[in-house]
Regions:
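Charged, compositionally biased N-terminal leader segments and the immediate start
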Residues: 1-25
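Residue-level signature of catalytic and energy-coupling elements of molecular machines
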Residues: 11, 48-50, 108, 137, ...
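Electropositive phosphate-/nucleotide-binding environments in soluble metabolic enzymes
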Residues: 12, 34, 51, 55, ...
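Primarily NTPase-proximal linker/entry elements flanking Walker-type ATP/GTP-binding cores
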Residues: 17-136, 143-164, 169-188
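Structured loop/turn residues at secondary-structure junctions
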Residues: 136-139, 163, 229, 255
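Conserved catalytic-core segment of NTP-binding enzymes
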Residues: 146, 167-181, 195-301
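Short glycine-rich anion-binding loops that position phosphate/pyrophosphate groups of nucleotides
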Residues: 191-193
Length: 304
């Protein structure tokens, strides 16, 4: 299945629920007035875009409508698509400029973190990059085993220690291996942590110190994996992790299983954190690089 078709299918629930309602609402109006904008804002908020972002979209839409002299409500959809694509632009590409580069993957348990790492490793390997996986989620034996399966599937080397080992020591070993084997990217799994588990946040700080000491000039990404089905809770999680540890990007999983795709806008506009990848299915190649234009097109289903 093609790249665009995958995203389009993955956004079907959001498109049907949110964009479908917007489309019906616009058809019920014969002119563009305050009531139309109020209803649009309400529908955007219901679509998990968030109140501040919904207001921002509608204010920009008002200005564009006025400036371009648009009178027909049916013309609003294409403007809305443009505004949303513009809002999502910036920072969506991974920074992997150095060899090795390092990607630290964080998130609470149950969001699809280890699966995301496996799919990302597979995608980068397909691009010809030599990838090493670091099994630094040492709290759960199952996490190490799961990562081993993904390492095998994506044909990547895995660096691991036994359950309960010091996660920072695993990262140190992975960095040493990457230097010795001239690897391009190290992807590090970490324990599923909640913002309020102080020892887990301390552990993350220790991991960061090891990375900064051993790879001071390396390109570093800190990716937070979020479950799209949790809607505004995902936005709250992103804010808490951002404050605690700093985040360079978001991987939004399970978009295909929810009508809450609007959280992409809430995260990028509300928090200023770019979405770098989206998960739109169960298959190994269903983790897709996030591209604002393709996302907006798929959401409004303009192109086939």
């Amino acid at each position: 299945m093609g790249f665009f078709k995958k995203i389009k299918e993955g956004l079907k629930k959001t498109r049907d629920a949110v964009v479908g309602q917007i489309d019906s609402m616009l058809k019920s109006f014969t002119k563009i007035d305050d009531e139309l904008f109020e209803e649009l804002e309400e529908l955007l908020v219901m679509g998990d875009v968030g109140v501040p972002t919904a207001e921002k979209i509608c204010n920009e839409l008002r200005e564009r409508v006025k400036k371009e002299g648009i009178k027909d409500p049916s013309e609003i959809t294409s403007l809305l698509k443009e505004i949303i694509a513009d809002m999502l632009r910036g920072g969506e590409e991974l920074d992997l400029a150095t060899s090795p580069s390092i990607i630290l993957v964080i998130g609470v348990n149950g969001v699809g973190k280890t699966t995301t790492i496996g799919k990302l490793a597979n995608a980068l390997s397909k691009e010809g990059k030599k990838v090493i996986l670091a099994a630094a989620d040492t709290f759960r034996a199952a996490a190490i085993e799961q990562l081993e399966i993904w390492a095998d599937r994506s044909k990547c080397e895995i660096i691991k220690q036994k359950e309960g080992s010091d996660p920072a020591a695993v990262i140190y070993d992975a960095i040493s291996a990457a230097k010795a084997r001239h690897a391009d990217v190290i992807i590090c799994d970490t324990a599923g942590r909640l913002h309020n588990k102080k020892h887990l946040m301390d552990e993350l700080a220790k991991i960061n110190r090891v990375i900064d000491r051993e790879l001071p000039d390396a390109s570093k990404e800190k990716l937070l994996v979020l479950d799209a089905t949790t809607g505004q809770n995902a936005v709250n999680q992103a804010e808490q992790f951002r404050q605690a540890t700093g985040i360079t990007g978001i991987v939004l999983t399970k978009l295909d299983g929810t009508a809450k795709g609007g959280v992409v806008l809430a995260i990028k506009d509300g928090l200023g954190i770019p979405v770098k990848y989206i998960g739109v299915g169960e298959q190994i190649d269903d983790l897709q690089p996030f591209t604002p234009d393709a996302f907006a097109d798929a959401l409004f289903s303009i192109k086939e």
